[in-house]
């Protein structure tokens, strides 16, 4: 007989328990975008620095209309360190140092979508374990929700605080105005707003800034030198993880453009560089020349990413992008402006079913079609349908996907000392549960997302981590929870037994002094 039970909480501890925190609710009406216009916030930080302070005062923020909504933009969560060990990676034949940049929107809708609310059916992206950088594509500078920064940082992922968007064919004057703004110099010739850029990012807790540079400013000397100075200051202040992302229409790195789009030997890396796709597909033909140009310039290839248009994930040049040469190039997936294509293409018969299928779709894209990194289809250029008509066809989505696990190593941000605790919260719920009882209605707050499982899902034969098993199905569900709004459901039957490996950790534990507490429902 098949059996199903819920795992709602797990606590690994030397007999220590930390109480959970109730979710914070808010109304969208408090998020006023007007104070962020015309670089008013950066002006405040520049004024504060001129007066000997790192940050503006409460009164100064209020003078431009930023009041209590300010705290919803701030994050107070430091980025956790990540731990990688190639000898323990599930997939062995990859470039273990290759990185994935998800240049995606955070939440649904421009400007407001990812902020805490009472809206259950919102984007709760959860594949941080393969994501090195997240782009926050649907927000202006410094407006990415603090709740999303919290979630990314818990899982060791860098996340930009928003984007400036410039298009040469749709120039409203903002590109030239912004270039003039950042080019402003002090009497001693230094850039007036460079320190403000660094201090503002530190204050709001994000890891820097992102640009869509499809105009002409990226070739301007002041543009390059200003951002080089911003990076220099951040490095001088030992601000780990700070960076500046930039996408241009350049599909490759060359001797002539490297100093504009990436960096140079004198100043080092200036931008995290997202290269363009070609014909809406991965521009794999340019990779070899790009790598050669980067090496010639004396720079590392660590921060250059070949761009990929996410809507075409199911029929891109994945074989060609995973040769011995091309796998040395990182990849940046983009898609698109107001919502992630993953979130847009979710289907379901009810809000709960939609959310469950959304997580399944993410798992197929990252862990492979079988949702187990040990059992993945071979890398190919045909991953199966990405967009389907309705919930009846959900099983067809990416049903031949090899997953990004076939290209990138998993990472864990779980280290240090015990305790380690999780309630398997995704960051939303149709109800809020506390100790298994319903205490509140629907909610959405990515700050409440727990550290996600390292593996989605590593089900193996008992005692054999090299052999996959499919007797037991594991998935997230919002139908019940112990604390928060979600848990994981295990269902199926096995006579020989299966192991389910959820996390890789680097925890320090004393022999014989570790206790595990689990909250289960429906198990016997």
For each feature predicted by the language model, list its residue ranges.
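Solvent-exposed loop and beta-edge segments used for protein-protein assembly and interaction
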Residues: 94, 203-205, 325, 482-484, ...
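Short carbohydrate-recognition loop motifs
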Residues: 464, 470-499
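Chitinase-like catalytic core of GlcNAc-active glycosidases
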Residues: 93-289
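Substrate-binding surface in catalytic domains of secreted glycosidases
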Residues: 212-381
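Bacterial Sec-dependent N-terminal signal peptides
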Residues: 1-25
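Extra-cytoplasmic beta-strand recognition segments
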Residues: 442, 447, 453-463, 488, ...
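N-terminal module-boundary/linker segments of secreted carbohydrate-active enzymes
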Residues: 24-118, 122-128
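Substrate-binding cleft of secreted/luminal carbohydrate-active enzymes
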Residues: 28-70, 304, 308-460
